[in-house]
Amino acid sequence: MFASILGKIPQYSTISSKCSLKECRKVKKVENSDEIGEIIHRDFLDPFCNEYVLIGEEETSLGINYLQFEEEIRTFEIRDSDIIVASYPKAGTTWTQELVWLIGNDLDFKAAEEHLDKRFPHFELCTIVNFAKMTEMLGSTRPEYIGNSINYLRDLEGTRFIKTHLTYNLLPEQILNGNRKPKIIYVMRDPKDVCVSYYHHGRLIQGWRADFQNFSKVFLSEKIMFGSYWKHVLGYWEHRDKPNVLILTYEEMKKDLLSVIRKTAQFLDKKLNENKIPQLLKHLSFESMKNNRAVNQQDKIESRMKHKLVPEQGAFMRSGTSQNYKGEMSEELILKFDEWTKKSISGSSFVTEPIADLYLNTSQKSVPKM
């Protein structure tokens, strides 16, 4: 699939960056020295992201392109008026973004026809792949909100809506030191569903070639892009009591979307137009979202298929259900995930939460409210 492209450049050449691996503190390359490293080097790397690195004490796994933007991210000027939707990939991010944007913009459905990536830019998107190399090799350009997302956000006026998959400790320092207090809405989801969805997303959007068995191994090794699921969740969870942080779950959104809408509106200090609530619920339904080109990423899928960059055809929004993993995971793998979850949350306050029982397939049958 990638033979014609891989032949044009050295497979694992180091991309030049402002911060070399030697200069950066606590940055390690993911070496091709064990089973996980072999899978990553064989099935995850390509000319546009040709190395993974582990960043910081938590060893968050990111593409090497991140190092080019590390300082810009750290020193990015945050505003108190910013609204951030943060999540681990495939935890319900797009759904939450659209909900938050519409509430924040007084249910302006006409304005929501503009592409979500432009209205609600992905902060670190420019770090995920080397867009300069992509333009050079494929001859296609990307709009600034994709190819230079940090600069695009920096120049936006008014309230900025920002998406990120970065761990809490990699957010701009003005958030970490408390000098700025933007609204942060974090959404999480059963990690088993996240893994299945991330697998299909990776093949459809990223061009990853791993089969599900090998993908699951990398996911559980916590060397998948954006690192450990539970370190990610617990990093934000620790800040849940701050007045500028709201924690949502995908499962609660599926069970009672209206209550999540009202809770989010209250958090954002926005008054809802009750007459437009039915339209909002319809707009946020799975079928509507799946067929909405402003949010369904169909343009990206078509572009990647055109250039033969992805090994799988499909839709960005696949099932829109909870516990979909049961149709794709073996009982053995489900047990492995649950043991990993128990170990990962042990000793944290999260372990006493009802949602933890739901994620562990225990006696908790109903979806708890956060």
From Swiss-Prot:
E.C. number(s) listed in UniProt: 2.8.2.-
Biotech exploitation of the protein: LST may find use as a new tool to modulate existing biotechnological applications of the firefly bioluminescent system.
Domain of life from the UniProt record: Eukaryota
Binding-site residues for 3'-phosphoadenylyl sulfate, renumbered to this chain: 90-95, 189, 197, 250, 284-289, 316-320
Location of the active site: H165
Pfam families in UniProt: Sulfotransfer_1
UniProt function note: Catalyzes the production of firefly sulfoluciferin from luciferin using the sulfo-donor 3'-phosphoadenylyl sulfate (PAPS). Is also able to catalyze the reverse reaction, i.e. the adenosine 3',5'-bisphosphate-dependent desulfonation of sulfoluciferin. Can use either D- or L-luciferin stereoisomer as substrate. Sulfoluciferin, which is not a substrate of P.pyralis luciferase, likely serves as a luciferin storage form in fireflies.
General remark: Both D- and L-luciferin stereoisomers are found within the firefly. L-luciferin is the likely biosynthetic precursor to D-luciferin, though D-luciferin is the major stereoisomer by static abundance.
Similarity remark: Belongs to the sulfotransferase 1 family.
The protein's name: Luciferin sulfotransferase
